[in-house]
Amino acid sequence: MTATFDNLSAGDVIDGPKFAVSRESIRLFCDASLDYNPLHLDDDYMKGNFGKTNFGGIIMHGMNNFGLISRMLTEWASPAGAIHRRLETRWVKPVRPGDTIQPSGIIKAKQATEKSRWVLIDVVVKNQKSEKVATGEAMVEFPRDLFCQ
C-alpha cells in the first residue's frame, strides 16, 4: 500500500532493501565518490592502530549507509508524492566486506502545518547479526495539494 500522510501512525515501520557488501561494492563507491582513502582499499594499512581502534581490514564508506537510507526513504515516499527533506546519521559500527546490511525506519511523529505535512522518522541500518551500524533521524514532507489551497 502506498504511504499517505493520513494513514501513517507513530510506530509504523519502513523496511529498506538488503545490501550485500563486497570488496567490489566498496571499490565502486570509491570510484563514485572519488574517495580513495586507504580505510576502504588497503588491508595492510587497516591492520594498524588508529588511536585505540584496530579495524583489522578495510571498511565500507559511512556515506554508503547514508545512500541506502536515502534510497529506502525515497522509494517509500515518492509514490505518494512525498519528498525526503532531511537526514542526519551517525556511524556506530564499521561495515566490512561480507556483511549484509539493511536500513529501516520507524515513524516517530507526524505534524500538519498550514503549508505542509511532515513525518519524522528514526532510521537505523543493521548488519546480518542485527547489530546497529548506523542510526539517525529523517524528515519527509507530504506537500498539501497546491490546487486545494
Task: Provide a role label for each language-model segment.
Residues 1-2, 86-92:
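Short structured motifs
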Residues 60-63, 73-78, 93-98, 110-113, ...:
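N-terminal start-of-chain detector that recognizes signal peptides
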Residues 1-13, 96-149:
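HotDog/MaoC-like acyl-thioester-processing domains
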Residues 1-83, 145-149:
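Hot-dog-fold acyl-thioester-processing enzymes
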Residues 46-51, 89, 134-139:
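Short C-terminal domain-edge/linker segments immediately following a structured domain
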